[in-house]
Amino acid sequence: ADLLTALYFEVMENDPSFNMEGKGEDIFLFSNGHISPVFYSVLAHRGYFPVKELATFRQINSRVQGHPTTHEGLPGIRISSGSLGQGPSVACGMALAKRMNGDDKTIFVLTGDGEQQEGQIWEAALFAPHNKLENLVLIIDDNGQQIDGPTEEVLRLGSFEDKYKAFGWDVMNMDGN
């Protein structure tokens, strides 16, 4: 919650009136949708939609579902989550488009450590530095857990820091709590 609150209230230039194009504003992509309650709470308190709508979480016909989707029409949701690994690839495309259109704003994307086991993640990890996408910030929630158990037991990936540095990323570690 702290990380998303800091991004939406202190770091990112974002407009709760929301338009999907995001011209002239920073964009946040939520790739690890299973932690959606935190994301929805930040969006509601930032003014993207009424806070009272949070009480409808996962109810039939609610716009606040277990995994955010663009289909629900909820302001602040730019991509559907659920298919792990897509967020960074979409972020690369958006960062490249912003640069090509002369928009100097930043794309932020949040992923989970279990999600790092998806092949598409590594294509994006190679693509971004190769194309000098300096307007892209990838955040990995490295909590050591995924749906099938501890990430080290499901599929050991080793040091994310070492891998991303080897691909040409500037890497920073932080305690997000």
Label every model-predicted segment.
Residues 72-76, 141-145, 162-168:
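Gly-rich Lys/Arg/Thr-decorated short loops/hinges at beta-loop-alpha junctions or inter-strand turns
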Residues 31, 110, 139-141, 174:
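Generic beta-strand/beta-sheet core signal
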Residues 1-130:
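Cofactor-binding active-site loop characterized by glycine-rich and histidine/acidic residues
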Residues 121, 141-143, 176:
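Histidine- and/or cysteine-centered catalytic micro-motif in compact active-site loops
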Residues 49, 53, 135, 156:
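Short acidic-hydrophobic sequence patches enriched in Asp/Glu that either
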Residues 102-103, 152-177:
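Conserved thiamine diphosphate
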Residues 130-154:
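A short, conserved beta-to-alpha structural element at the edge of catalytic cores
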Residues 106, 134-137, 170:
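Residues at the starts of beta-strands that form the adenosine-phosphate
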